[in-house]
From Swiss-Prot:
NCBIfam families attached to this UniProt entry: deoC
UniProt name for this protein: Deoxyribose-phosphate aldolase 1
GO biological process assignments: 2-deoxyribose 1-phosphate catabolic process; carbohydrate catabolic process; deoxyribonucleotide catabolic process
Principal EC category: lyase
Organism, as annotated: Staphylococcus aureus (strain MRSA252)
EC number: 4.1.2.4
Subcellular location: Cytoplasm
Assigned keywords, A-Z: Cytoplasm, Lyase, Schiff base
GO annotation, cellular component aspect: cytoplasm
InterPro entries assigned: Aldolase_TIM, DeoC, DeoC/FbaB/LacD_aldolase, DeoC_typeI
Annotated metabolic or biological route of this protein: Carbohydrate degradation; 2-deoxy-D-ribose 1-phosphate degradation; D-glyceraldehyde 3-phosphate and acetaldehyde from 2-deoxy-alpha-D-ribose 1-phosphate: step 2/2
Cited Pfam families: DeoC (PF01791)
CDD domains in the record: DeoC
Amino acid sequence: MKFEKYIDHTLLKPESTRTQIDQIIDEAKAYNFKSVCVNPTHVKYAAERLADSEVLVCTVIGFPLGASTTATKVFETEDAIQNGADEIDMVINIGALKDGRFDDVQQDIEAVVKAAEGHTVKVIIETVLLDHDEIVKASELTKAAGADFVKTSTGFAGGGATAEDVKLMKDTVGADVEVKASGGVRNLEDFNKMVEAGATRIGASAGVQIMQGLEADSDY
């Protein structure tokens, strides 16, 4: 099992500089991570720097609130792909979910999935803002909309992934949709908990620390 391929090496801070983007790109290339996940403004640069590697470029759409219009999310998606994005992590309309406007939530996801045709789409449901039933419903809508992954968190809402939420999401979507855990995965112990709960992708700024922990662990 190639654990490095579980990791989306992530830098989404608004103050991220080109120097910091260079650092995570260099680290991702060194460890052969699945992707680097950066804000849309950095996608074109990252794609150019990663053109000679297997590392993919992931970006975020409707981030971090999910409260932009569907048309805006579609434009962001098309623009990101034109700039070289391989994977799209979008945020759902959280307020619509809480209102019970499930058709609106699903159509929002479907529009991004259509705009990103041929590219992986991960749907951020922001678990820290949801109760048990809302996590289940958001996961069901993600699956119904044809997305590839359901993802826990933006990291901007005061909480991140928990193993319990990851398991609930995985139990809900089954084998057809994967689960990405993000937010607060800082070391090998956190990583292992998420993978054991059913995550097959981990969004983390601590990818290097996780891999160093794996290298130091005689079980791997």
